[in-house]
UniProtKB/Swiss-Prot annotation:
Keywords: Electron transport, Endoplasmic reticulum, Heme, Iron, Membrane, Metal-binding, Transmembrane, Transmembrane helix, Transport. Interacts with CER1, FAH1, FAH2 and BI-1. InterPro entries: Cyt_B5-like_heme/steroid-bd, Cyt_B5-like_heme/steroid_sf, Cyt_B5_heme-BS, Cytochrome_b5. This is Cytochrome b5 isoform B. GO terms for molecular function: heme binding; metal ion binding. Membrane bound hemoprotein which function as an electron carrier for several membrane bound oxygenases, including fatty acid desaturases. The chain crosses the membrane at residues 107-127. GO terms for biological process: alkane biosynthetic process; very long-chain fatty acid biosynthetic process. PROSITE patterns: CYTOCHROME_B5_1 (PS00191), CYTOCHROME_B5_2 (PS50255). Residues 5-81 form the Cytochrome b5 heme-binding domain. GO terms for cellular component: endoplasmic reticulum; endoplasmic reticulum membrane. Gene3D superfamilies: Cytochrome b5-like heme/steroid binding domain. It is found in: Endoplasmic reticulum membrane. The gene is CYTB5-B.
Length: 134
């Protein structure tokens, strides 16, 4: 294996994103899968949607057979420059601000929720008594 593998940038590989010229990146290797598009069991859309990015996760998630992995070697064209692949950023949800609410307003609301219906009931009873005696 005296041959030096050609090194491609992700930008260069991304230019090959059509059905007549389709390259993908899997495990740091670049493959020209144009001739395989029609034969791919998942259809050509699967491969075309994997262009322009590191498709390793897409490839591994499907669970390809050992024969599929061996078949890939015939489409090998070089290596990807790892510095051109964007780093995967782990999503961290934004921190929720801590609200230091005044407990007094909460207490007043609960008190009013109790007193207002009680006052309405008292008013209704008072009107009833007043109209009966009058």
């Amino acid at each position: 294996m005296g041959d030096e593998a050609k090194i491609f940038t992700l930008s260069e590989v991304s230019e090959h994103n059509q059905a007549h010229d389709c390259w993908i990146v899997i495990n740091g290797k670049v493959y020209n899968v144009t001739k395989f598009l029609e034969d791919h069991p998942g259809g050509d859309d699967v491969l075309l949607s994997s262009t322009g990015k590191d498709a390793t996760d897409d490839f591994e998630d499907v669970g390809h057979s050992e024969s599929a992995r061996e078949m890939m070697e015939q489409y090998y064209v070089g290596e990807i420059d790892p510095t051109t692949i964007p780093k995967k950023v782990k999503y961290t949800p934004p921190k929720q601000p801590h609200y230091n609410q005044d407990k007094t307003s909460e207490f007043i609301i609960k008190l009013l929720q109790f007193l207002v219906p009680l006052a309405i009931l008292g008013l209704a009873v008072g009107i009833r008594i007043y109209t009966k005696s009058g």
